[in-house]
A protein has these predicted regions:
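Short N-terminal amphipathic alpha-helices
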Residues: 56-72, 78
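Short beta-strand
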Residues: 67-71, 169-175, 216-220
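Basic, low-complexity intrinsically disordered segments
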Residues: 71-126, 130
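Signature for HUH/AEP ssDNA processing cores
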Residues: 106-174, 184-193, 310-313
Length: 313
């Protein structure tokens, strides 16, 4: 990776060009402050993206990517970017779905180009390009109140139930307020089948813990209960990627955890851009390390429960 410099006084403060495998990525305004409270400039943000890339790239590879851009930093205005930003460099891979030309984030060159455009958050599709089947199952826990002190307790209860079903799972902070439970699976079941299974899990947990969980779709009707969003895991939808930075004032990062860590009740803000890469050097990629598993036996075992819930609709 090399740097071509213009006038020395300007190159270090206004722009630099990175040469990555023969592709050139211009980094503009590296001193622009993206996270004022954390003192993280665009230059530092891109440095941390490089360190996160061995983990973030596998989570996004081969998927339709939506980003959230904050041109003036996380305290400024933002917008969702679905169509590939233009002009799109020739090294950037894209894929079209429903008339939208999405970026497909397969390499570090593309990641740095997006980082320079102040793409802070990375939200990939829940399936691969041109492949309708999911490669994992995700249960999303969404608090109804900010700084929900019971979110890790709720995650632990979901994990315990999955374990009773014979399923291994990896919890991750969303990087905002919620927690997602990732269940690596062998491809086969459809999104519809996994949503039906999610409904069974969610209904059972709501029945057992009515003061903690809800599946009420309207937020105004949830009270203080934590919403089990089993509907989010679907074709055409996205979720915050593992290891993506988030646009919070404390520069949080969506971080996979061990179940032992969950029981110690960490806060999502404990994992941020200034410590995430160092942590990952110690833990590795907890999601990629978890072997994929066949979920068909669970679907078969709970078929009667799934059918009963379908009749209630």
């Amino acid at each position: 990776m090399g740097t071509s410099k213009g006038t020395r006084s300007q190159a270090q403060t206004s722009s630099a060009t990175l040469n990555i495998g023969g592709n050139h990525v211009q980094i503009t305004n590296p001193d622009k402050m993206l996270y004022p409270e954390m003192g993280i400039t665009k230059g530092r943000f891109i440095q941390e993206l490089v360190r996160l890339s061995p983990y973030l790239l596998p989570a996004c590879e081969g998927r339709y990517l939506t980003t959230i851009r904050y041109p003036d930093g996380v305290s400024g205005k933002f917008f969702y970017q679905k169509n590939a930003p233009e002009p799109t460099p020739p090294y950037v891979q894209t894929a079209v779905s429903e008339g939208i030309s999405y970026v497909v984030l397969n390499d570090i060159t593309t990641l740095l180009w997006l980082g320079n455009l102040a793409c802070i958050e990375y939200h990939p599709s829940l399936h691969k390009v041109h492949d309708p089947l999911p490669t994992e199952w995700i249960i999303d826990l969404d608090p109804s109140v900010e700084d929900e002190p019971r979110i890790m307790e709720a995650a632990s209860l979901v994990g315990d139930m999955l374990e009773q079903l014979g399923l291994r799972s990896v919890p991750k902070t969303s990087g905002a307020t919620g927690v997602q439970i990732v269940i690596p699976i062998e491809q086969g079941p459809s999104f519809t089948q996994l949503k039906e299974l999610g409904h069974v899990v969610a209904a059972y947990l709501c029945e057992r813990h009515p003061k903690l969980f809800t599946i009420e779709r309207f937020k105004k009707n949830r009270g203080t209960n934590i919403y089990i969003d089993y509907m989010q895991h679907d074709k055409g939808r996205t979720i915050a990627a593992p290891y993506t930075p988030r646009a919070t004032r404390y520069a949080s990062v969506s971080m996979p955890l061990t179940w032992d860590e969950v029981r110690r009740n960490p806060m999502p803000r404990d994992f941020h851009l200034l410590n995430a890469a160092d942590r990952l050097q110690l833990t590795g990629d907890l999601i990629q390390l978890e072997p994929k598993q066949h979920i068909e036996p669970v679907l078969e075992a709970l078929a009667s429960h799934i059918a009963a819930l379908q009749k209630r609709r």
